[in-house]
Structures are given as structure tokens and as C-alpha cells.
Amino acid sequence: MDAIVVSKADRTPRLVDRPRPDPTPGSVLVRTLRVGVDGTDHEVIAGTHGGFPEDADELVLGHEAIGVVADPTDTRFSAGQLVAPTVRRPRGDPTPQFDRGQPDMAAPGTYVERGIDGADGFMADYFTSPADALVALPDSLAAHGFLTEPVSVAEKAIELALASRSAFDWRPDSALVLGNGSLGLLTLAILAARDDTETLYCLGRRSRPDPTIDIIERLGATYIDSRTTPVADIPAAHQPVDMVYEATGHAKHAFDAIDALAPAGVAALLGVPAAGWTFEVPGSDLHRSLVLENKAVVGSVNSNARHFRAAADTLAALPDWLCDAIVTGVHDTAAFADAFRDGETSIKTAVQFDTR
Amino acid sequence: MDAIVVSKADRTPRLVDRPRPDPTPGSVLVRTLRVGVDGTDHEVIAGTHGGFPEDADELVLGHEAIGVVADPTDTRFSAGQLVAPTVRRPRGDPTPQFDRGQPDMAAPGTYVERGIDGADGFMADYFTSPADALVALPDSLAAHGFLTEPVSVAEKAIELALASRSAFDWRPDSALVLGNGSLGLLTLAILAARDDTETLYCLGRRSRPDPTIDIIERLGATYIDSRTTPVADIPAAHQPVDMVYEATGHAKHAFDAIDALAPAGVAALLGVPAAGWTFEVPGSDLHRSLVLENKAVVGSVNSNARHFRAAADTLAALPDWLCDAIVTGVHDTAAFADAFRDGETSIKTAVQFDTR
């Protein structure tokens, strides 16, 4: 079967022939429809994030997949069902976090991540997955269901942010998303669909005309250009915000976000920064602001099957124009390299292995 | 009546004569028993925190009070009842946070704090308070009930910390308190009384023999000397911890605490740092650790009537030896200055205005 890999010797994605995997009892053989590409994939390809499976020189790419059950073996799934796989699997014996259904909360070193770190991903004609790492999707999501994974990541961050404020009567009204990549735009879209955030902002560093700015404004949000209005200036230029969602991985944002918050606000950090950057911060002022204004910061990574189910509901309820606008390219395996090209107008791309 | 004030002209506490206040309907006249002294009082006296009431050159000190209802007017209280007052009152018209019973979540500028900022405190033979800012205490707390305020501050921080982890199945086992002052020790005592924290640490910078180290060890916790084991070294020297409670206001602790956390852990910040200290941090590593390990940081200040009620229950259940060990001096008004002296062996002091 076709599979798209990166190898230790060749740091560009290549199409290779791999044997079709055989499902064992308890696992499911899935015929892949589409697999999305995101910033993490580019880091995996560049070798700055993740790693190869043990004893392997190649890694099958892809962690944002949708497919159709080809062989359910003895599981609760039926052939033909639409499914999306979660990303983490135990590295060795499952830890209690896996037993509790929350591998997303597991400690580094206790898991592999399919298509990212230590385990082959889903960019192949077929893949297998344990049934408990698969979530059924409604038929309406056949086209855009590969967005379930990134939407689930945003769902989890929003859940953690709201939970952090659940000890008191909190009535957020405004939110700011840092980043207008696909994860930032999906987070913004989820917030726009919620009742509790009337006023939305999204920060980027692009000039008009730009398709992401069009999406931001069509969602009813205000675009903020970080080149003219840095994060720390947002309260003065616009307003202090109840929630910040950091979706760029730019490390200074994690600290500036504290200043952008209204009293009792929360900053959720989704973007993963590179290691090793040391810089000055107004340390005691940030600490003071956290304490005296009851602010919170929550980090959030990955997502579990529960978040995938919530994401499927969310995705099914998002307006059609939105996914059409965010998904700027779906490329079949013959043209797979186009899915890994970052263009001025590209937002989210996917490789298509098959159609329903 | 007797009152203990600090004045713009004289930055040492003085005993003065003040007229006894008259309660208006809806408010209660309280005969003061004891008022505690904490670090905030010392900052108020030094002029580094808080401020005088509008148009006044003197501030009555004290925000940790217990007293007896002298005149309940038309309120739900009865004469003779033991009560503790909360600290914040509206500055001008009450904001929605006051209407919701959570002045502790109010924005700076919308409140005054009795004995701290813009309103006279409780260090007087009598004070008045709106009934909704008073909490009834059981008779058993007549001696140590002035600790209700600091215990309520710790209760709130613990509540916010736990809430921040409530979106998933979290099973904390270890906690680290930074600071062995009275707030740190009370926080440690509350954690020791809970079922969910088997392993406790408390960090200070004192040498044995020391009464705070004795308390820490009698509570079953391990004392960590920050001069030999800085916060960031605690995971290697002891273990990564599920919770950190920062009760010193030392700004670097707020950042080092992130490194001390186990995956999915939370750092609660209670101590209030001075403003204006800028320093270098391993910014992207901290950001990365927050995200990849799902860590949280929550700031917490003040407390509301609900936290006072929880604190009264907590305080009533603490072992007798503990409050006896923490309260190192109760001084009557004739010797009030002793309550403001910080000695090697003093932990928590109070001024006694009257006895039950």
C-alpha cells in the first residue's frame, strides 16, 4: 500500500510501498480517507520535534486522520463506519493515565504519538488502531472529519480554561486568540459558536488582503496585527480580555498574555515552543498581576477520545463556509508533496488516500 | 475607645482614642476580641502596600479579626454571637462581583480593604460591619478565630488550584508549600488535614533549632532549606510535586514553581510580590513545560464569606497543638507594640482588645 514517510536519511516526505497492516483482536483496520497536515508535521519532517519508532529509520507521517472501518475484528465498530483515531499510545505498559482514558495527561516518556514520536502515523492507505483509540464520526463529516483532531485539541484547551475558573461565578465576555494558523482559526471558530464570548479578537502578522483575516472577520472577530499592536498593548488598544488562547508557540506570548487578561481571566497555552530561549520578563509585575487579579495560566497538549467526541459535535455544527475556507487544499497521493508546501494563501491542507 | 493606627506623619503603630462607631441598619456593632498581625500589616505600616482612607491622615490597622456582636441592629445576628469580618468593601457603588458575593474576585480600584487600603481596619475596641461581610464562628474558636481570615485565604487558593484540575481525573499525592511564615504553615496544616496529599514539603530558610521547622515536621511534612535546595532542584532532590503553594511573594518562586511541578500539576500563588523586579527566565522552557505537561498556575488573593465559613470549619478541626504553636504571642492593648515586633521565634501574633 501507499504510505508517506520521512526517513533519517531523507528529510523530505516520500511516497513508499508498505505492507498493509493486519488487525489483531481488539483493534480495527481502517481504510484511510484523508490525513491533515499541521505545524507539528513540519517540525517532525525537519527533525525538530518527535522521533522515529524504535529500530526504524523511517516514520509514516500524519496524526490528523479520518477513515472508514475496513475490518472491525471483534470490536464494537462495524465495517463502513467513519472513524477518527486519537494520537497517543502507551510506550510499554499503559500507565494509569491510559487506564483512566486520559493519555493526553500522561507524563512525557510514557507514550508514543502516532505520526509524531516513536510510532507510525496515519498517512497510508490503511492503518490499524485499538478500538478505544478510535472515535465514530457522523457521515456528514466524511470531507472535513480530519479536522476532528485539531478541533479536539482546542476543545481540551477551552475545557481546561473554563475549569480553572469554575470555583467562582465567572462570566467571560471576551476572548483573544493568538495565532491565525489553522489551530488558531479553529479555536476562534469554536469560541464564536459559544454563547459566552461576545467579543472576539485574533492576532496575526499578515497584511490585507489575506484569507485568514477574511475568516477572522467573517467569524465576527477583530483582527489585530501584532506588528502594530503587540500582545501587551491589546488592553489599551482594545480591552483586557477574559480569555487568551495562545496558538503560536511564541514563548514571549505566554508571558505577555498575562498582561492582556482582565481580572479573573485565564490564558490557555496550546502552541508548543522550541526549547532553549531565555529572556527577561517583568517577573514581579507578572507574579503580582496573577495574584492581585486572580489570573490563571493553563497549559494544554493533545486530547483524548472524550475531546474527540466533543470535537465531532462541534465540527458538525460549524458553518460549511468555515471548513471550506480553512481547508485550502486536499491533494491525492500522486500530488502529496503539494500538501506539505506552505503558501501565502494556504491555511490547512490534507492528503487524500481514498474517497468514501 | 482604643484604636491602633498608623499615620502619614508617623509610620509606627500608635494607640489613639477614637469615638465608638454607631451601627446603621443592616450593619452590626462588634466588640473586638483579638486582631492578628501579618506581613501585609507590616507593609501597610511601612507604606509599601495599601493606603489611607480618603481625606484621612490615619488608618486603623488590622484585617484579621474576631469579635462578639454587641448590637446586631436589624440583621440576622444576635448579641453575643462570635463573628469574623471579611476584608473588602465596595469603593463607591458595589460592582457585580460584590453583588455575586465574591468581592475577592473584584478588579483593583473597585474595592477598599479594611485595615489595608482606603478603609479603617479592626484594631479598635469596637468596629461596625455590614451583616453580609460577617461570618458566624462557633464558640470553640473564641481564642484562635482571628486565624479565620488567613485560613480563608489558603482555602481559596486550594479551591482555585483544585478547580483548575477538575476537568480530568486528577489524583494529587504531593504538595509543596513555599514559605514557613504563618500563611505558609496554615496552608501546610490544611493540606495535612486533607486526604489527597500524602507527601508534604515546606520550604523556608531557617536553621534548626527553629519552631517553624518543628511545626512542619510535627505535621508530617519534610522541611526543605532553600539555601541548600532551591525550588528548581526540588524534583531532583525530593520529587516533582502535584501542587505548589507559593506563600512568600518572592517573584522568582512563581516561575521556579513550574519546574517543581509533576505533569498535570498546579502552582497556586498566594504571596504578593513587590512591583518592579525584572529578571531573566528560561522562557521557552517554562512555556514548553506548561504546555507539554499540562501544568497550571493560578493566582489567588483575598477571600469571601464562603471561604470564611469553610475556614471556620477547617480551623475548628485543626489539632489544638497547631494553633498553640503558630500563635506565639497575644498582647493586650497596653503592650500592643510587642505584636508588631518580628522576633526569631515569633510566628503569628495578635492584639487582644477584650476577652469573651
UniProtKB/Swiss-Prot annotation, chains A, B:
EC number of this enzyme: 1.1.1.47
Keyword annotations of the record: Carbohydrate metabolism, Metal-binding, NAD, NADP, Nucleotide-binding, Oxidoreductase, Zinc
Cofactor(s) essential for the protein: Zn(2+)
Gene3D superfamilies with a match to the protein in the record: Medium-chain alcohol dehydrogenases, catalytic domain, NAD(P)-binding Rossmann-like Domain
Region (Disordered): 1-26, 86-107
Binding site for Zn(2+): D38, H63, E64, E149
Chain sites annotated for binding substrate: T40, E113, E149, N302
Pfam families xrefs: ADH_N, Glu_dehyd_C
Residues involved in NADP(+) binding: N180, G181, S182, L183, R205, R206, L270, G271, V272, S300, V301, N302
GO biological process, one term: non-phosphorylated glucose catabolic process
Domain of life (superkingdom): Archaea
Top-level EC class as recorded in UniProt: oxidoreductase
Catalysed reactions, as listed in the record: D-glucose + NAD(+) = D-glucono-1,5-lactone + NADH + H(+); D-glucose + NADP(+) = D-glucono-1,5-lactone + NADPH + H(+)
InterPro entries according to UniProt: ADH-like_N, Glc_1-DH_arc, Glu_dehyd_C, GroES-like_sf, NAD(P)-bd_dom_sf
PANTHER family xref list: GLUCOSE 1-DEHYDROGENASE, ZINC-TYPE ALCOHOL DEHYDROGENASE-LIKE PROTEIN C1198.01-RELATED
Function text: Catalyzes the NAD(P)(+)-dependent oxidation of D-glucose to D-gluconate via gluconolactone. Can utilize both NAD(+) and NADP(+) as electron acceptor. Is involved in the degradation of glucose through a modified Entner-Doudoroff pathway.
Sequence similarity: Belongs to the zinc-containing alcohol dehydrogenase family. Glucose 1-dehydrogenase subfamily.
Protein's UniProt name: Glucose 1-dehydrogenase
Species classification: Archaea, Methanobacteriati, Methanobacteriota, Stenosarchaea group, Halobacteria
UniProt gene name: gdh
